[in-house]
């Protein structure tokens, strides 16, 4: 019987001679390769889309997108202060701010210690500034920056008292707070209870409540502008080239009323600081990153993560880094007071006296809380905006760069011998700028201070460099699309 040629092919072979199983494997490989190619193409397309439109990525993928692109996957709209031409009062305040004739020496103005070129901080690396009638007197503290003070509340102890016409009894508030355990500060976490600590106010010790109150201080300080009395200031104001502007705004009789003249002059200085956007520009790279308009480098992004890490730097425990719910940009301070135990600065002339101690809230420059010794050694937490522009750091100007500052935080407790000097017997003089009876006030519970001598520091050298890279993104004047 004749059979077709196909009938002679074994059942496991196709006509071409390939086993069916082999062909099936080839087919499967093709499917897998095709699927892999599709996945890769999709991943590439997704990555490209994420790179261009990171803000459109699902929230669940935010961390991944942030790490890959350096962009903020959840941008926000920041509510910056409104910009408008300066009012006549603010323009008058600007004249006063730059007027050297108001000092006893005739050579010093507000801007001498608060330079616009240095974010309204000193334009030199001196630990304290030189002033006085003959420009020969050394100060006691480095002048803080005048930027980002427009939201500063008056000094209080415990929760903000809000608007009230009733004078606040600080001694009574201090007594009420004395029995309350200090709340631990944790980055990106709200405290479990209201913080019963000093907060708000101006100067390192909070002794002024408003910009107007703060402005008069240097004018009559014997180591600053050195006028002997407020009346001396009024006399100088009455001979300025802008006295006619005072008369136009407040009436011709103001020149004969020293108290009113000074009050209106200091109000004008305060208005200048409120209205001029250079005092609170919010034009840093970080601001634009928050808005999705700029991207952080890997080092800057890692630095931000460490800044916000409660177990690492924990900087955001005091230097708040997140916008408010209604979009107010962060000013990088909780405006509270801390005793950090920074080492004594021998470069300050006053410190040559071994009995002199600058103890912040409890003296010597404010006396109303001198008996509240639980606050000795506490100083205002400053903003970190424009911190990379500063040339001295902390209330005594003991450090001159951010690396030294970060080393202090990292090594104060783990390697105190690297931070503090030794006495004649070789013992490390820890917290040597604070009398021994107040050492318990120093923060030793919040990271990175929650470690003991010999422990591993919270941050590596690489971590510190990345944090510094992030801190530099807080400088105003960043141009979107460039540096």
PLM features per residue range, with description:
Residues 2-483:
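Periplasmic c-type cytochrome electron-transfer domains
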């Amino acid at each position: 019987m004749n059979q077709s040629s196909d009938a002679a092919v074994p059942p496991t072979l196709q006509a071409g001679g390939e086993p069916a199983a082999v062909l099936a494997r080839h087919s499967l490989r093709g499917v897998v390769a095709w699927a892999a190619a599709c996945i890769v193409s999709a991943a590439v397309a997704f990555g490209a889309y994420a790179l261009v439109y990171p803000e459109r990525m699902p929230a669940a993928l935010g961390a991944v997108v942030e790490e890959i692109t350096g962009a903020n996957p959840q941008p926000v709209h920041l509510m910056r202060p409104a910009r408008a031409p300066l009012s006549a009062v603010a323009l008058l305040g600007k004249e006063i701010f730059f007027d050297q004739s108001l000092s006893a020496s005739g050579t010093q103005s507000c801007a001498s210690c608060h330079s616009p070129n240095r974010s309204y901080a000193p334009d030199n690396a001196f630990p304290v500034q030189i002033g006085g009638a003959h420009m020969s007197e050394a100060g006691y503290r480095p002048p803080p920056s005048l930027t980002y003070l427009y939201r500063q509340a008056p000094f209080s102890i415990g929760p903000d008292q809000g608007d009230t016409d009733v004078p606040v009894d600080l001694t009574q508030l201090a007594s009420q707070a004395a029995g309350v355990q200090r709340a631990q500060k944790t980055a990106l976490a709200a405290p479990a209870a209201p913080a019963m600590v000093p907060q708000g106010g101006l100067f390192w010790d909070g002794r002024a409540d408003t910009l107007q109150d703060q402005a008069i201080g240097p004018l009559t300080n014997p180591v600053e502008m050195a006028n002997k009395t407020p009346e001396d200031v009024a006399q100088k104001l009455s001979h300025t080239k802008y006295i006619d502007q005072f008369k136009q705004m407040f009436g011709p009789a103001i020149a004969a009323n020293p108290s009113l003249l000074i009050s209106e002059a200091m109000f004008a200085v305060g208005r200048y600081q409120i209205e001029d956007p250079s005092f609170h520009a919010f034009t840093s790279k970080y601001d634009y990153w928050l808005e999705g308009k700029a991207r952080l480098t890997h080092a800057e992004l890692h630095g931000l993560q460490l800044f916000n890490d409660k177990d690492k730097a924990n900087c955001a425990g005091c230097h708040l880094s997140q916008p408010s719910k209604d979009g107010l940009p962060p000013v990088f301070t909780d405006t509270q007071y801390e005793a950090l135990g920074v080492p004594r600065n021998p470069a300050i002339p006053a410190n040559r006296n071994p009995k002199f101690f600058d103890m912040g809230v409890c003296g010597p420059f404010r006396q109303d809380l001198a008996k509240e010794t639980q606050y000795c050694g506490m100083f205002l937490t400053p903003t970190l905006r424009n911190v990379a522009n500063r040339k001295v750091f902390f209330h005594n100007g003991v450090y001159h760069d951010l690396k030294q500052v970060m080393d202090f935080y990292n090594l104060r407790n783990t390697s105190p011998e690297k931070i503090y000097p030794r006495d004649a017997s070789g013992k490390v003089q820890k917290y040597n700028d604070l009398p021994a009876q107040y050492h318990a006030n120093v923060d030793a519970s919040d990271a990175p201070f929650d470690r003991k001598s010999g422990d591993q520091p919270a941050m590596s050298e690489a971590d510190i460099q990345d944090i510094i890279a992030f801190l530099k993104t807080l400088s105003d004047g960043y141009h979107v699309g460039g540096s």
